[in-house]
Structure formats: structure tokens, C-alpha cells
Amino acid sequence: MNKQVLLKNLRTIPDFPIKGILFFDVTTLFKDAECLKIMVDELYEYYKDKGITKVVGIESRGFVLGGALAEKLGAGLIMARKPGKLPAEVVEETYEKEYGKDTIQIHKDALNENDVVLLHDDLLATGGTMAAAERLVEKFGVKKTYVNFIMEITDLNGRNVFPKETDVYSLLSVSEKQ
């Protein structure tokens, strides 16, 4: 099974960034051509009939597969960035983090009410960043929004921050208790 290939190639680093945390390093999946192809193909199969017009990649690892997936779906790519990184007028959403606030932005002309949007990032942990990205995209009055991750850490219950009607899909589900 393809997901087993991904799990086999996923690097875990104990006690990073602090003691007691098991860090899942997706960069090992990006560097392997077979894994990269599996991820793009699996995501394409899931979303190919959903009418996606724009893929929004979340800074920065969401850009990696976001671009490849957008091309395969025949959709445009929008980059959701931290403040000060986009040159034109932006729309933003500020959200709470464990130790303060953060903000995510996209260009004001990036989306419209006719778009069907796929939000993509590498990892679902607590869900705060992606929930903010979803609220940001909703400000444009888009037709539909889908949320996707390469990997979900199930112990952290991040999917619970999304409204029940949000379609949340993760290629891989992992546990910090492995």
C-alpha cells in the first residue's frame, strides 16, 4: 500500500524541539521521488472530482505539494504568507497561538466567490494555523473550501477546531505515542 511506503520513509526525531516531543520530519518524504509522486497522486485522486479552482498553500511547507497538486488539478496556486511577505494589498486573519498571536495573509485579488478552494499544509497538529487560513478564505465568499494535510497527529485532536461541515482529509494519521 502506498501509505505504508510513506510511513516507512517518514523520519521521527525523539525529544525535538523539546524533551518529550516526537517530531515527525516530512522533509524525508519530499526528498524521495517515489514518496513525492505517491503524495501528489493520492491527493489528486481524492480531489480530482471536487471542482477545485485554487489551491492555497500555507507557508512554507504547504507550498511544496500545493504547487504540484494545483498543476495536476488544473488549478491556480495561492500562497498564504506571514505578514510582510506579499507585495500587493492583502487580506489577513490573526489567530491565537500558545505564546501569543500570529497572522496569515493572502493577496486581496487572490480569490473570488466562484472559487472552490483546497487549503493545503504539511501537518495537522492543533489546527490553529489552518483554522485561521479557512476563516481567511471564507472572507472572499468562495463556493466551497476543502482542508488537507499530508499528516495528522491524532493525539492533538486538531481536526476538532474545524466546523463539522468542513471536509478535512489527511493522507497519514500518526500518534506521538508510537
Q: What label would you give each PLM region?
A:
Residues 8, 131-178:
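PRPP-dependent phosphoribosyltransferase catalytic core
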Residues 1-52:
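Active-site-facing substrate-recognition patch
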Residues 122, 127:
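Conserved G/P- and acidic residue-centered "switch" motifs that form tight phosphate/ATP-binding loops
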Residues 73-74, 94-98, 163-166:
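Short, hinge-like loop/turn segments at secondary-structure boundaries
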Residues 53-54, 116-118:
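Structural motif
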Residues 78-117:
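Short, glycine/charge-rich flexible loops or terminal/linker lids adjacent to PRPP-binding catalytic cores
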Residues 41-94:
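Conserved PRPP/pyrophosphate-binding segment of the phosphoribosyltransferase/PRPP-pathway fold
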